[in-house]
């Protein structure tokens, strides 16, 4: 019985040691992958397409406004056969940004009155 108990403890110890080493290997790989993704995102962030500019080359490259990212909207101009794509802000998001800005200003006034 003592032999079985000793063997079980040894087996659990070896298993936990090997699992810890495997996790360390995965952590190192994850860190390297995360760093490369961050570098790519930083490079991509510098290359965003401003509002009302052509985004047909990359429809996910529109810049962010204060709160929301602009959307690449495509349409056919009147009397034209070519599709035109530009980065635009949807109206509902524009109104939400205006409301958030007014709420910030109102919050500042309340702080000034009571603060």
From Swiss-Prot:
Signal peptide residue numbers: 1-20
UniProt GO MF annotations: toxin activity
Main location: secreted
Cell compartment(s), UniProt: Secreted
Record flagged with keyword Secreted: yes
GO CC terms in record: extracellular region
Top-level taxon in the UniProt lineage: Eukaryota
Disulfide-bonded cysteines: 48-63, 55-72, 62-87, 74-85
Pfam families reported for this sequence: Toxin_35 (PF10530)
Keywords assigned: Disulfide bond, Knottin, Secreted, Signal, Toxin
InterPro entries, A to Z: Spider_toxin_CSTX_knottin, Spider_toxin_CSTX_Knottin_CS
Propeptide: 21-44
Tissues/organs with expression: Expressed by the venom gland.
Similarity remark: Belongs to the neurotoxin 19 (CSTX) family. 01 subfamily.
Domain remarks in the Swiss-Prot or TrEMBL record: The presence of a 'disulfide through disulfide knot' structurally defines this protein as a knottin.
Name of the protein this chain belongs to: U3-lycotoxin-Ls1a
Organism: Lycosa singoriensis
């Amino acid at each position: 019985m003592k032999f079985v108990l000793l063997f079980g403890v040894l087996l659990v110890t070896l298993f936990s040691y090997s699992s810890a080493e495997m996790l360390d290997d995965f952590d190192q790989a994850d860190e390297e992958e995360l760093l490369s993704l961050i570098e790519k995102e930083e490079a991509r962030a510098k290359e965003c397409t401003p509002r009302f500019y052509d985004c047909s080359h990359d429809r996910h490259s529109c810049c962010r406004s204060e709160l929301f990212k602009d959307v690449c909207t495509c349409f056919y101009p009147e009397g034209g056969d070519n599709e035109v794509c530009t980065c635009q802000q949807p109206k509902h998001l524009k109104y939400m940004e205006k409301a958030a800005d007014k709420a910030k200003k109102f919050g500042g006034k309340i702080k000034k009155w009571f603060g």
